[in-house]
Regions:
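Nuclease catalytic cores that cleave nucleic-acid phosphodiester bonds
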Residues: 2-5, 11-170
């Protein structure tokens, strides 16, 4: 059983405009989705990122990008907050833990009543930043240890000596 993160997408974008900007919502959404996909995959977390549909439809639009990542646009008369509150209640027995990412105070209070955990946007951003550092450290470490894998190092010492003699090293 794994964890589920329900993320209020626009709340995250507008909470940290220095990271996402406010001029182009499409590129801000794309950047947030990329960061969350990477974080979720690296930490085995299921993610649902919810955006207010703002008058676009009368039905929920869901785009499933993988078995552990989905994007939801709410219908015109439903806010991301109400969708997240409903989903956190409906899914409460399907996951080990449900985390709701928002810095909206009333929404945080509501989801706590459903048994979910709240994650402030600042805390999520800290986790994303440190997870990225951990990934870079892991990659750098593995690249250094695997940089050159010579077959000679895996040969028995007696064979290595004979090869060295043939090359004139001993």
């Amino acid at each position: 059983m794994r964890d589920l993160y329900l993320v209020d997408g626009y709340n995250v974008i507008f909470w940290v405009p220095d990271v996402f900007g406010r001029d182009d919502l499409e590129s801000s959404r794309k950047k947030l989705i990329d960061l969350l996909q990477d974080y979720g995959a690296h930490n085995n977390i299921e993610m649902i990122v919810v955006f207010d549909g703002m008058g676009t439809s009368t039905k929920v639009k869901q785009e499933v990008l993988s078995d552990s990542f989905a994007i939801v646009f709410t219908p015109s008369r439903m806010t991301a907050d109400s969708y997240i509150e409903k989903e956190s209640y409906i899914r409460r027995n399907e996951y080990r833990s449900i985390y709701v990412v928002t810095s909206d105070g009333p929404e945080q209070s509501q989801v706590l009543g459903n048994g979910s955990y709240r994650v402030a946007v600042d805390d999520l951003m800290w986790s994303l930043k440190h997870d990225k550092k951990d990934q870079h450290t892991f990659i750098k470490k593995n690249n250094q240890t695997n940089r050159r894998s010579e077959i000679g190092h895996s040969l028995p010492p007696s064979v290595q000596e004979k090869l060295d003699k043939l090359r004139g090293k001993k």
